[in-house]
């Protein structure tokens, strides 16, 4: 079912009329441009779904996917609105189970992820990896399948009702270390170039950049995405996590080869022979 307006409680009610479980996975992208878009995705949509779930007599469980690091004082618009969305949802549906993943990685659609950024840098910048100066936060990458398993286990366990879980991978990396792993697996010598944040913003606003190059780099040069790499997206050890859901998450190191297969496919997309070899 495709809704016209996810912020409409009426449409959400129609969508869940035959459901006893509601799972909200809707969220803003890190390259969303307007404050309204963040508020719609992270606050208004969850509120509409929570109200619809509360009003539906047959809905027994509500799972809300938020984000680790959600904080009202964060410099990130995404994380600020994620926190506000959590508070609104808990007020409407107190029995909601909130899952807060860190940096999610997947090998289905790598383009809007760090693997996608790495691929673009290989194709356009001749294998050079650039980081914004002073923005090398720590992160605990988590595989998207582990988040899906967390949802399933949460639904099976009644003790998860009304609880919040921080879900992160077993190891902590800096963003530079993640890119270095990509380099090492692809057999390319690591080379990182630091760019001042002011220079990146100036480049983003160049007139010649507004057409073709804006479309090409729009994801990676949005200020929200650039500053994301300054954030520490790690779990709070005081909060409940994967262990409480009886899950041992897969480490980034074990999955990096799968990500690189997708990187190779994108990087060699002009060559059908290389496409086939990358997928073997």
Give a label for each model feature.
Residues 1-54, 68-72:
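NAD(P)H-binding glycine-rich loop region in Rossmannoid oxidoreductase-like domains
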Residues 7, 41, 139-142, 170-173, ...:
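Residue-level signal for the nucleotide or nucleotide-sugar donor/cofactor binding architecture
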Residues 9, 13-19, 47-50, 144-152, ...:
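Short, amphipathic alpha-helical "lid/cap" segments that border enzyme active or binding sites
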Residues 25-26, 62-68, 99-101:
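SDR active-site strand-loop-helix element
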Residues 39-43, 63, 82, 140:
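Short alpha-helix in the Rossmann-fold core of NAD(P)-dependent oxidoreductases
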Residues 54-61, 93-94:
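A short helix->loop->beta-strand "cap" motif at the edges of active sites that frequently abuts
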Residues 73-188, 207, 215:
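Oxidoreductase cofactor-interface core, primarily capturing Rossmann-like NAD(P)-dependent enzymes
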Residues 198-280:
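A hydrophobic C-terminal alpha-helical subdomain
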């Amino acid at each position: 079912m495709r809704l016209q307006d996810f912020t409409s409680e009426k449409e959400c009610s129609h969508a869940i009329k035959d459901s006893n479980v509601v799972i909200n996975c809707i969220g803003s992208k890190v390259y969303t441009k307007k404050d309204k878009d963040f508020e719609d995705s992270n606050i208004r949509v969850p509120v509409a779904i929570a109200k619809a779930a509360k009003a539906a007599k047959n809905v027994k469980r509500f799972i809300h996917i938020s984000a680790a690091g959600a904080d009202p004082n964060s410099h990130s618009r995404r994380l600020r609105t994620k926190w506000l969305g959590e508070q609104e949802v808990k007020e409407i549906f107190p029995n909601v189970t909130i899952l807060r993943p860190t940096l999610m990685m997947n090998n289905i659609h790598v383009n809007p992820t760090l693997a996608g950024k790495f691929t673009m840098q290989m194709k356009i910048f001749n294998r050079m990896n650039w980081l914004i100066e002073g923005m090398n936060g720590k992160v605990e990458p988590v595989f998207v399948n582990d988040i899906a398993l967390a949802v399933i286990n949460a639904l099976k366990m009644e003790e998860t009702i009304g609880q919040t879980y921080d879900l992160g991978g077993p190891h902590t990396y800096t963003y530079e270390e993640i890119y270095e792993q990509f380099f090492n697996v692809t057999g390319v010598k690591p080379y990182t170039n630091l760019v001042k944040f002011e220079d990146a913003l100036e480049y983003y606003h160049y007139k010649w950049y507004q057409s073709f190059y804006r479309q090409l780099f729009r994801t990676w040069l949005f200020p929200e995405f650039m500053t994301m790499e300054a954030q520490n997206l790690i779990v709070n050890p005081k909060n409940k996590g994967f262990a409480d859901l009886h899950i041992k998450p897969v480490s980034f190191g074990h999955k990096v080869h799968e990500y690189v297969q997708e990187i190779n496919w994108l990087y060699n997309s002009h060559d059908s022979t290389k496409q086939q070899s990358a997928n073997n």
